[in-house]
Structures are given as C-alpha cells and as structure tokens.
Amino acid sequence: MAESQLLIHTIKDAVVVNFRHGSILDSLIIDAIARELYALVDARAARKIVLDFGGVKFLASQAVGVLITLKRKAEAIGGEVLIC
C-alpha cells in the first residue's frame, strides 16, 4: 500500500488534515490525496473536516477541483469543510 499523502488527526468534533508535501502539483499525488479525502467523507469519519494548508506553498488547479468536490460531498451528508 502506498504511503499516505495526508497527516490526519482528530480535535474534538473535527478531523484535521495536514499535507505531507509543500508542493501539490503532481497529478498522481493529487489523485492519491483526493482518494484519501473522499474516503473520510464516505466513511463519515467526521462532519467537520479542517484542511490545514499551512505548509503548502504551491497548489495545482487540479487540486482546487478536488477541494470543490470534497466540499460538495461533505455538504451532501450534512458536513462541512474548512480551509486554513
């Protein structure tokens, strides 16, 4: 199994996600991140997902599309996605 692209921990009622890479530009990395993020929503791991982009310097437009889809998926089950 491939190494996770995310560092995930829980604080109170939220799942907090940090990213292992400061540059999220490669489509294979973005696809792996998407699978992991969507799995959090599909498993209903938390109603609130906080994405911490503090260590990210570069983000491809493909990754923005992933964030939009993640937000829609979360809202469809009554959840929310927060970005910091």
Language model feature labels by segment:
Residues A2-R35:
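STAS-typified acidic loop motif
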